[in-house]
């Protein structure tokens, strides 16, 4: 059901049609015993996200059982494909702000040290929204900004207008690129719940758009005492690695 699982009349009507079709097929083929309702269970893409998972799952199961009982058909084994829900919260992407530039009287751009098109391709392809938070400098005043990537492509930016969600981040105090330890040092930002599709679509280990290097990959787990443990999975891609792939 291509709308995703939402508490709307359209979704419930489509689910009802799906289950009724299963019942019709079950009467023709008694060996049929399973129903795949697909994916579409949403994940948190904004801090304001509010979704009653327990209610929705219980209601889906209840409606399937009700229709099958009415049609005198044994209820099926239910299969789902909740990919985004399963893996979405497993990843985050961290960027640093290289520099800030004023485009005009209204647009203040924070330029990140990577590319949205290569690391989070859904932001470019379908204006996907993700949770954006400042990693440091929470004690500073904040300002509305736009986020741009490093590539030469005019589409390499986070489209906050399409998401109707302005981006507010701590004020940048450096006129030139900041360095660690400098007054108003490097501003880091994180985009969270990025575990679904992004790396699979963007690719891993190859050559990216505009030769943007693949970022460093770090795995964060907890030990038996509940303490966070980090492990380097892959270093940031080097120019030598990219040139070797290209045959130089």
What are these regions (language model features)?
Residues 1-106:
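Active-site loop/helix belt of alpha/beta enzymes
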Residues 59, 65, 69, 73-248:
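Charged (often Lys/Glu-rich) extended helix/loop segments that serve as interaction or gating elements
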């Amino acid at each position: 059901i291509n709308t995703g699982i939402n508490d709307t009349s359209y979704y419930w009507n489509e689910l009802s049609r799906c289950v009724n079709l299963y019942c019709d097929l079950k009467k023709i083929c008694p060996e049929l015993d399973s129903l795949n309702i697909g994916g579409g269970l949403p994940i948190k893409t904004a801090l304001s996200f509010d979704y009653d998972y327990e209610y929705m799952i219980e209601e889906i199961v209840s409606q399937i059982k009700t229709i099958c009982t009415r049609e005198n058909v044994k209820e099926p084994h239910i299969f789902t494909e909740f990919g985004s829900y399963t893996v979405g919260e497993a990843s985050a992407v961290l960027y640093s702000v290289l520099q800030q530039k004023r485009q005009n009287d209204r647009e203040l751009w924070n330029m990140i040290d990577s590319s949205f098109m290569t690391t989070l391709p859904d932001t470019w392809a379908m204006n996907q929204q993700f949770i954006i938070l400042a990693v440091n400098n929470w004690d500073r005043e904040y300002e509305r900004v736009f986020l741009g990537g490093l590539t030469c492509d005019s589409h390499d930016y986070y489209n906050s207008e399409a998401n109707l969600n302005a981006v507010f981040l701590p004020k940048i105090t450096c006129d030139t690129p900041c360095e660690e330890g400098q007054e108003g040092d490097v501003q880091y930002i994180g985009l969270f719940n990025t575990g679904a599709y992004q790396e699979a679509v963007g690719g891993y280990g190859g050559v990216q758009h505009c030769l943007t290097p693949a970022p460093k990959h770090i795995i964060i787990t907890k030990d038996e005492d509940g303490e966070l443990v980090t492990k380097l999975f892959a270093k940031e891609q080097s120019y030598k690695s990219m040139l070797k792939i290209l045959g130089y």
